[in-house]
Amino acid sequence: MPNSQAKKGLFQFYPHNLIWLGLSVLAIVLDQWTKWIASTHMNYADPVPVLPFLNWTLLHNYGAAFSFLSDAGGWQRYFFTSLAGLVSILFVFWLLRMPKKMVVLPVAIALILGGALGNLIDRITLGYVVDFIHVYYQNHHFPAFNIADSAITLGTILLLIDTFFLEKQRPKNSDA
């Protein structure tokens, strides 16, 4: 007799995965809070030294990562907004379908999702992304970034670790 409790199909999800959405929300809240602090307490493009290799520098990014396409004429705002929205929807479905025994992969997806939505909020409400973390060494400057970018980067690193090292150790059929 088939299990009537078995969840199948596109909208299958497991309640235990709501905790991962909580991690995404935490990333969004932390990102938006720090951007608000930077925007209300800093002057645009005026560096505030923190450490010998770190400044807080309020900047507006009209492009993608590292200001890619920031001077492309305006179409990139709609492109990146649409792309982030679509990827976020796919990530929510993927996240909610994670088997219970998995940890690294859902953390990775939750961080990427939270970072993408944090920057998406900026694009929709401001037309640009607020960046304020500026790391440098002598005359070598890394492009300014924010907490959302950090969440996306950490999530991507965890996703690569999961893909290349942990996936091989998982049983083929992991149940939730």
From Swiss-Prot:
EC number: 3.4.23.36
Pathway: Protein modification; lipoprotein biosynthesis (signal peptide cleavage)
Membrane found in the keyword field: yes
A GO CC term assigned to this protein in UniProt: plasma membrane
Record-linked Pfam families: Peptidase_A8 (PF01252)
GO biological process: proteolysis
Catalytic activity from the UniProt record: Release of signal peptides from bacterial membrane prolipoproteins. Hydrolyzes -Xaa-Yaa-Zaa-|-(S,diacylglyceryl)Cys-, in which Xaa is hydrophobic (preferably Leu), and Yaa (Ala or Ser) and Zaa (Gly or Ala) have small, neutral side chains
Role this protein plays: This protein specifically catalyzes the removal of signal peptides from prolipoproteins.
Protein family according to the UniProt entry: Belongs to the peptidase A8 family.
Entries under PANTHER family matching the protein: LIPOPROTEIN SIGNAL PEPTIDASE (PTHR33695:SF1)
GO MF entry, a single one: aspartic-type endopeptidase activity
Membrane topology note: Multi-pass membrane protein
Major subcellular site: membrane
Organism encoding this protein: Acinetobacter baumannii (strain SDF)
Entry keyword annotation includes Amino-acid biosynthesis: no
Coiled coil: none
Gene of this entry: lspA
Active site location: 131, 149
Residues annotated as transmembrane: 10-30, 48-68, 78-98, 102-122, 141-161
The protein's name in its UniProt record: Lipoprotein signal peptidase
